[in-house]
Amino acid sequence: MFENMMDLGSLRHGDELIKRGFAKMTKGGVIMDVTTAEQARIAEKAGAVAVMALERVPADIRANGGVARMADPLKIKEIIDAVSIPVMAKVRIGHISEAYVLESLGVDMLDESEVLTPADPFFHINKKIYKVPVVCGARTFPEAVRRIFEGAAMIRTKGEAGTGNIIEAMRHIRKVNDGINVLLRLNESDMKKVAENIASSYFILRKETSKELFGYDNFPDMDDLYYGMDSDKIINGILKTLKEIKKYRRLPVVNFAAGGVATPSDAALMMKMGLDGVFVGSGIFKSKDPARMASAIVEAAENYEDYKTIADVSSGLQGMEGLEIDNIERLQERGW
């Protein structure tokens, strides 16, 4: 269905075509978090379409606390050398320099990730300034629109990383899908109002500065708000993204599940919900049998409506120990 609705040749820029095209190559597959070259080889053997190189899986980041940053370049190089599939790496939200460093290492894709400690309290990276494609998380339809406007080549649910609990990933895909459903019913005037509302996130810094300087937050100068863009350019760019979504009746980039996928059935559920693929963080290498779990999740994602096969590959498997959401820090709330 995605192929029928997406005309890659109609995308706006050459770089955008290449970035979205690369991301689309992962469609239907599973991307696995790995912390060592050996884990990367296990993931590749199990059928992962790509691996995400990082220092610690989200469950360990959550348990250990502290500031979580990009992985050691040496570790990333070791993982790149160990496998033939694409290697991704996480960058802190808004950390322009980390993104350039990772790009220089030759990673195939960046993940501007809420799992790491954010670097910028106001803005995400302008993904259009990098040659390497970038994936971003989204809890809601407006978040997804903002990230695509900024140049994200792939969107994923945020879920609640490191918990083994699928409920938040399900919440996020429901909200994004319902946002699309509402958008399809809007006229041009209503779409402009939606664009203005979604764009308001980029005005927060200027409003705060205005209040600090003048005592009120409606300073009329709205130039140079985000990477040199004024308010009109931001609103029109977001409106253009909304029109693209309305045209295709879905996000114009691949949309993956992430955050809490811990079993083959979880992976099948996400595919059943219409997602294009699955990220698995802690769910594989925090399970009792990582190699079997990795293969089973790949099998379930590929055959998500073949419930007999899912039952067979799940038999005897034990998932990671899960966490209830209510009493933990919500990593998903990082980002804006």
Curated annotation (Swiss-Prot):
Entry-linked Gene3D superfamilies: Aldolase class I
Annotated residues for binding of D-ribose 5-phosphate: 33, 162, 260, 281-282
UniProt GO MF annotations: pyridoxal 5'-phosphate synthase (glutamine hydrolysing) activity
Alphabetized UniProt keyword annotations: Lyase, Pyridoxal phosphate, Schiff base
Pathway in which this enzyme or protein is active: Cofactor biosynthesis; pyridoxal 5'-phosphate biosynthesis
EC numbers for this chain: 4.3.3.6
Entry superkingdom: Archaea
Name listed for the protein in its UniProt record: Pyridoxal 5'-phosphate synthase subunit PdxS
Gene source species: Picrophilus torridus (strain ATCC 700027 / DSM 9790 / JCM 10055 / NBRC 100828 / KAW 2/3)
Gene name linked to the record: pdxS
